[in-house]
């Protein structure tokens, strides 16, 4: 299964930080661990062919460089493209959502057929793009840390359980 992963870093990190600072830092400093869990242990969204495996061909991390510059090297070493999304307003609002949506829609037009779009964000603003992806017969997998709307969750083919992600993915490969 050809997959593309889009990480709304600010959203995931702040959601994890509300749970536990150490957990948030583990997510930010060890993306290779949870990437391996995604590749080796996370189920595929239905319907998947028997024996199919996930290949994450696109790895993009969208982050506010003013707040989270210190985590760039970890994501770079894990093979991510890093898209800087600095604050655009005096309240600190970034353009992460629109960058992610435009990139997802752009991938629909590419020669490579991506079977799965993985969205790491609890932001319900992604609900319309999840529905568009469904209309284009693409599978969607969502990780939402903290509260997410019922409509957003219902628009995903596969929801990664927040507790499973924290318990299994963030410690994947540790002995």
Question: PLM features: residue spans?
Answer:
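Domain-level signal for Mg2+-assisted phosphodiester chemistry and nucleotide/NA-binding surfaces
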Residues: 1-99, 109, 134, 139, ...
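C-terminal helix of von Willebrand factor
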Residues: 151-175
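A general structural signal for short secondary-structure boundary/capping elements
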Residues: 48-53, 105-110, 129-131, 164-169
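Short, basic, helix/turn surface patches
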Residues: 109-118, 167-175
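Short loop/turn motifs at secondary-structure junctions
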Residues: 55-57, 113, 155
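Active-site histidine-anchored catalytic micro-motif
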Residues: 95-98, 110-150, 157
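A residue-level signal for conserved active-site and pocket-lining positions in enzyme catalytic cores
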Residues: 8, 61, 104, 119, ...
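Phosphate- and divalent-cation-binding pockets in alpha/beta enzyme and binding domains
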Residues: 70, 103, 128-129, 151
